[in-house]
Amino acid sequence: MANNSGSDSKNTLYCSFCGKSQHEVRKLIAGPTVFICDECVELCMDIIREETKSTGLKSADGVPTPREICKVLDDYVIGQMHAKRVLSVAVHNHYKRLNHSSKNDIELSKSNILLIGPTGCGKTLLAQTLARILDVPFTMADATTLTEAGYVGEDVENIILKLLQASEYNVERAQRGIVYIDEVDKITRKSDNPSITRDVSGEGVQQALLKIMEGTVASVPPQGGRKHPQQEFLQVDTTNILFICGGAFAGLEKIIAQRGKGSGIGFGAEVKDPDSRGVGELFTELEPEDLLKFGLIPEFVGRLPVIATLTDLDEAALVTILTEPKNALVKQYQRLFEIEGVKLTFTADALTAIAKRAIKRKTGARGLRSIMEDILLDTMFELPGLEGVEEVVVNEEAVNSGAKPLLIYTEVTKKKDATAS
């Protein structure tokens, strides 16, 4: 018996990659001198699939074309065509500049981007989608939490630490990443005149951001927190990091309108009432001087040469956001109900009513989820305990009047109820 077991172990074949025996896997494929199991083949396919996905958009010089970038942005962000074109060209030129930096004596300067638009219009989503398209490390920072070095709050260089963490501490990858700084309109100077007292969360933060946005070698403590002399630091060159700043800039439209008031003089001049124009229309007339009046310092405005303005989302755009993108809210909730074995349907009137509520709240696309949660909360609470429900229909009454969505039961359940009665 001992000899038989010994000969069996000699005849057992093993995967040359993971070491599993032929009895532990479904299939073992033989090569000239090696074997590979089905599990290792699947793993290799996954790796190749990921590599293909990340390089699929790359053009001949390794950078997607502006048209390709814009096409992918269209899948996730509804409307905002002008902003998407501006971003696509700026990002394409930025990474083209990196790939061809040593091929000529002409030095191409970096073009950081400023996104201006009302709350919930897609600023953050645009930045996140760009990073995904380009397969580069991406991090977000909230400008309102930042303070000058030495004061209580988050140090500006912590932004670079977050980017390092996103790149798994690969310094080279981090140096080609994208940083999105949100709420940048909240760090404006508190008055038009330079102050004699320290403004550590306003102008002071703008001054601190200038260095890393223009390009400097930042000394970043690997564990974060405040610096001390005994620490080891990671050196990160920020010259090639693309900075995208975003903000709602509430009140900026009034500054633009005020500047435009004096444009119409004489009998033939067309005088347009500023109040009759929407915020988005006024933003298209933005000049750097308007940002200075708003409270950004000249040096900070100078570091953001590319400005993309986004408009308010109208009713039709919000309905499209609810239904069409790959990760549309309606699709997400339909998937949740599908897990329970129930079909979720929204009537056209219901979708329009949801869009109208979001416009009334002035929260843009960001407010759509909270409205959907309000409508479906009771149904999602009760549904797991109900039997025989095959469909839930959300109509206009459920949105506007607070009525419960309609529950449609299977024929079997109806017959049971009829028999019981």
From Swiss-Prot:
Binding-site positions, ATP: 118-125
Family matches, as SMART domains: AAA, ClpB_D2-small, zf-C4_ClpX
Annotated ranges, domain ClpX-type ZB: 3-56
A GO-annotated cellular component: HslUV protease complex
GO biological process: cell division; proteolysis involved in protein catabolic process
Disulfide bonds: none
Entry binding sites for Zn(2+): 15, 18, 37, 40
Pfam families: AAA_2, ClpB_D2-small, zf-C4_ClpX
Record's function text: ATP-dependent specificity component of the Clp protease. It directs the protease to specific substrates. Can perform chaperone functions in the absence of ClpP.
Family: Belongs to the ClpX chaperone family.
Subunit structure: Component of the ClpX-ClpP complex. Forms a hexameric ring that, in the presence of ATP, binds to fourteen ClpP subunits assembled into a disk-like structure with a central cavity, resembling the structure of eukaryotic proteasomes.
Protein name as catalogued: ATP-dependent Clp protease ATP-binding subunit ClpX
Protein species of origin: Cereibacter sphaeroides (strain ATCC 17025 / ATH 2.4.3) (Rhodobacter sphaeroides)
